[in-house]
Amino acid sequence: MAEASRNNTGVGSSAPVSAFESFVSKYFVRLLVGIAVGGGALAFFVPWMLYIAGITGEADTNLRLHILYVTGGIIAVLGLVETRHKNTTDRAKALSEQARQFNETIAKEREKIEAEKAKNEQNHIRQVHAERRSRYTTAIEQLSNRENATTRLGGVYALIGLIDEWLADGALLTNKERRKEGQVIINSLCAYIRSPFPLAERAEQLDGEYTKDLQNDFRGDTEKFDADKRAFTRDKAALEEERQIRQNIIKEMREHLLDAEEPGTWSAFDYNFSNTYFFYPIDFSDSHFSASLDFTQATFTEKADFFMAAFAGEADFSKAAFIQDADFYGVKFTKRADFCKASFGGEANFFDGAFLQGADFSEVKFTGDANFSRANFTEGTEFFKATFTGDGTFYKAKFNGPILFSRALFMRNAAFPKAKFGKEANFFMTIFTKEADFSGSKFSGHASFFEVKFSSSVNFFKTKFAKNTRFSGAQFNGPTNFSITIFHSKPEFANTPNKSYKAKFSHKAAPADYSFKTAAKSPYKIETREQEHNGVKFIIPEDAMLFDPDNPFAWAEL
């Protein structure tokens, strides 16, 4: 406390001196002249006044001298003060200059240190990147080693590790640069997946047991038999090794693409699997693809699993061949999904799928059952010339955009119960070989069944048609049910106004199998008439006609 008091006192006491020195320095000449003149005046006038007052002698002389002494003393003190102030100022300037030079030196040293640090960091970055690229080159060489599967697998994991390193390098690279470096490696892995493997063509044979017979195939030549069996065993092992390597690549990709709700660390990469021959199962379930995905002309020899996958970028499966089952349950396509001219040899499951910009299934071949139940098509969707060899199920499917099924072929049952067609639904010249079920469906836009062929039964029970509905030129070969159907526009069974392209109803169906009793609340009814064939009376739509389905040239009304 005492020291603090002393410090405070010192600071306080120095302030007046500093102010006094500044004052003296500022007005030094004036003070000097003023004091000299004043002192001289006093030395002259005071003795003179004393003389007038009658005080004379040595007193006035002594007084004059004392005044001059005091004046000289004051002038001397002022000179000392000025000298001290000048010295202090010069010293302060010198210290300020020293401080300035010191700060400049420090700043230059700091800049030098920062520059050296930046240079070292750049060198470090270059070294790190050079080391990674060196490891990349080594890994590619390992991946190219056809003699040793273990070496190839090591190359795979080295590349995978490098991708993660690049992506984690936030301190050295921008996000765009990290993605660019990772994409290079992804391209290499995809290229490896796409590369042909000759033994894959014999996968079906090599996956089984050795079946050749010594006597029948080699005429008892034991040496040839043993050599062929050894070659089979060697090829079988090589195929399995390569299968494991490629499956591991897909497995690692999937683990970095999880999950479907949020993008994974590898989701932003483009994946090119075009023309790939997958001789092993593919599992991309729950994967999230944010960028483009290309499976054009790819062949899936075993199950392809895309369960609950999300495709935020372009997804192209055009001309892909799925030999076994393909599971797209719950998938989400943010952009238009392209399956044009693809083929599905097993079951194709798109149950609960979401197609936010529609889909193209033109000329697709579904050999197994195709399930699109509860699927949601937000934009226009095409099944033009699609072939359904198995059942085609669209239970509660939602087509919010235009839907095109023209010239499609359903070889087995076609089920559209409770489906919703938000805009135009076009089934022009579609062929339904077995049952066609539209019961409970709702057509909010125009519905065209122009020249459709219903070879078996067709069910429109409780179906709602909000706009124009055309059945002109359609063929009904089996039971036809329009019971409790609602039409908000008059249904057309022939072209107007000339009544050409009449709908045709087979005379081989039982009359009771034809039901045109629409709902009581339907604004429009199906106007009917009675027509007789060989003594059998049929009730058919007014503008329709009976025909013989066994006579392809029987276009005229019977």
Segments predicted by a language model, with ranges:
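Eukaryotic N-terminal accessory cofactor-binding modules
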Residues: 3-5, 13-15, 21-22, 54-57, ...
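N-terminal leader/targeting and pre-domain segments
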Residues: 125, 137-141, 147-153, 157-160, ...
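Helix-centric, low-specificity signal for extended rod-like, repetitive segments
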Residues: 23, 57, 77-79, 103, ...
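Membrane-embedded hydrophobic alpha-helical segments
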Residues: 26-127
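Short helix-capping and inter-helix turn/linker motifs at the boundaries of alpha-helical repeat units
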Residues: 129-134
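Extended hydrophobic/Leu-rich segments
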Residues: 20-24, 72, 531
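Juxtamembrane interface helix immediately N-terminal to a transmembrane segment
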Residues: 5-38
